[in-house]
Amino acid sequence: MPCYCLPGGLQNRAYCIVTSNKQHMVISDSRFVPPQQEGGKADIVETITAANTLQAKRLFVTARNRLFDIARWGNISEGISASFQLADKNGHIKNGLPQVGDHIRINVPGPGSSAGAGYDWVRIEIVQEANEPDKEFAVIKVRPSAAPEKQKGTAHFFDSAATSSFIVNREGRHISAEIHGRNEKPNMETEKVTDQIRNFVVGAAATEGFAKIQWQKLAKGILKVQTTRS
């Protein structure tokens, strides 16, 4: 069995960790993951199991910090093709923790959305954390939105009924990174025909599995630990 070293200066100690991509939803609260009603959906779940609770808590903190460091999602996700930037309600790039009302600016390969000045945009609707002795979680829920400077329309290849929920969860020794997409349909309610064509092509590719591949890379990156052999 492979052994992994905890990041953050603990490379002198090896801990055995079991990895898995068992597809079950750990978080089922409809506030965080809305009901599926129409269009496509995605459920990505990656899990690791720590040797003990102390190690699990440390791994959770690392994963939680990666979840909230949105600008580095592309850096921690091997092979992901999109890039992400956290922006405030006015569209200005910002550092620090995400807040409700902030936006995420997404740069998808290929032609960009003219409605979003070349980018796709989502607005953060929920940022929530909970910490209990044997259970912890952190959640970011987003929805396609207008570009901040326009405040109308939807500058995204999915329409505004879609949501994406990004979750890090710990129960005992088990830590999961989850990404749940709901009600994903191409955004055809745009002013320009070129945007409609682009959104149909990109949105269809996303619902057919391309987005799932990208999100799985992000989930793996959030949970990634450095490996050594004992």
What is each of the regions a protein language model found here?
Residues 128-145:
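Short, solvent-exposed secondary-structure boundary/capping segments
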Residues 8-9:
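Residue-identity detector for glycine
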Residues 3-5, 15-103, 109-116, 153-230:
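Mixed-charge, low-complexity intrinsically disordered regions
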Residues 117-129:
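Short beta-strand-centered aromatic/proline hotspots
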